[in-house]
Regions:
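Beta/alpha (TIM)-barrel catalytic core signal, keyed to glycine-rich beta->alpha loops juxtaposed to Asp/Glu
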Residues: 1-130
Length: 130
């Protein structure tokens, strides 16, 4: 909401969270959104992979996700998903309700000298720390 109010374009880098990321970046409590039963059910109803639903949800919210893939069929599916078969308001609300502020890419590899852990990279409470 803040970004929209100030004309800032929201870009979702790695919007699926890279469930297949390296072991060094995984934590036991991590949950990949594409594995959530509610998201899988919505994906099944649309006949697509749960990752496509995540991209569709981001675009319908006004964000510009940047999904990664090495496969041409996924690029095509990602492009088609934002122009066809929109999510219903009920589906949008269901997905919104799943938010647990979970990050699969926490940024361990981006920590600077002196940083304690990945929490130093994020404004988890909405307060920017300088």
């Amino acid at each position: 909401d803040y970004c929209r109010a100030h004309g800032i374009e929201v870009v979702g880098f790695c919007p699926i969270g890279s469930p297949e990321r390296p072991e060094r970046d995984k934590m036991p409590e991590d949950i990949a959104d594409i594995e959530l039963p509610e998201l899988k059910a919505i994906a099944a109803a649309h006949g697509v992979h749960p990752a496509v639903i995540c991209i569709k949800w981001a675009v319908q919210r006004g964000a510009s996700p940047i999904p990664f893939s090495l496969k041409e069929k996924n690029y095509t599916m990602n492009l088609k998903c934002v122009t066809e078969d929109p999510l219903t308001e009920e589906e949008m609300e269901t997905i919104r309700s799943l938010d647990k502020n979970n990050r699969l890419i926490k940024g361990h590899v981006f920590l600077w000298e002196g940083a304690k852990d990945w929490h130093d990279l994020w404004d988890e409470d909405g307060v920017i720390v300088k």
